[in-house]
Amino acid sequence: MPRDEMEACELGDGEGYQPLRLPRVQGKLEEINPIVAAEVAALERRDRSDADYEKVKMLYVIYLRVHEIYDDQARIRLGVRRKKHLGDLTASRGAGLRSFEALSSMIPLPPETGEFDTGGTSSSVRSASGASGGAASTAASGGSASAAASGASGGSASQSDVSSRSRSQQAPGTKGKKQ
């Protein structure tokens, strides 16, 4: 709208530009949460007048409450993703091997290529598997020879059994590398 047309408009009471109003607060927000009350009490007065200090104090309380409500909603909707919480989790679990094992067990690994993977079953795999064809096919498709041999003695082993055995035989930090 051009400026000339704006000046020609007549505005009634309560219309047009109005200064920003402070929010109306019913009751004392700092009484809801003692942590908020402690943080507001620690607010520095500096060189503010009484009216300015009360205004800043009220806005700080509102900010703290909104931040608290946002954190609650984020935990409910998004799950806990804050850095502080994740740091506390790793500190309580302990860093190192235990957390590595927990993380690596959750990530599915691709089938490992064994020493005997030549496109078909080799004679050493056939001799180790004996009459059990299930263990030989498992070893040829990515399992290890020791897993195939153990599968021959105890019946046929499934693919998940073989891959979990071969993972447990590897040292931590050598995921997918041949030893």
Swiss-Prot record:
Keywords: Capsid protein, Host nucleus, Virion. Pfam families: Herpes_capsid. Disulfide bonds: none annotated. GO terms for cellular component: host cell nucleus; viral capsid. The keyword Transferase does not apply. It is found in: Virion; Host nucleus. Residues 107-179 are annotated as: Disordered. It comes from the Viruses. Participates in the assembly of the infectious particles by decorating the outer surface of the capsid shell and thus forming a layer between the capsid and the tegument. Complexes composed of the major capsid protein and small capsomere-interacting protein/SCP assemble together in the host cytoplasm and are translocated to the nucleus, where they accumulate and participate in capsid assembly. The lineage of its organism: Viruses, Duplodnaviria, Heunggongvirae, Peploviricota, Herviviricetes. This is Small capsomere-interacting protein.
